[in-house]
Amino acid sequence: MKNSETIKKLGLVFPPAPKPLGVYLPTLVVDRFLYVSGHGPLKNDGSLIKGKVGSELDREEGKAAARQVGLTMLSTIINNYGNIDNIKRVVKVLGMVNATP
């Protein structure tokens, strides 16, 4: 199944992709690799999910925020390259969560 078909089947709704700002570029292509810059947890209305998991956010809210980061990254790829089906595989993901120890 193509990536675009999976997205359609899951009924995913994407938040707006971040725009380039100053030296920040949401994506960069080097050779045949697409590098996706750091993204924050954006709601579908474009506002930012704020708070620290364990104090301001509970576990489920933290999980939802992490999901939004992934959706925002997919939104960036789709908005910048139009076709998610060209992505063959993910090589590396660096994920960070603002959480209490």
PLM features: what roles do these ranges have?
Residues M1-P101:
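Short, polar/acidic, helix-capping and beta-turn segments at strand->helix junctions
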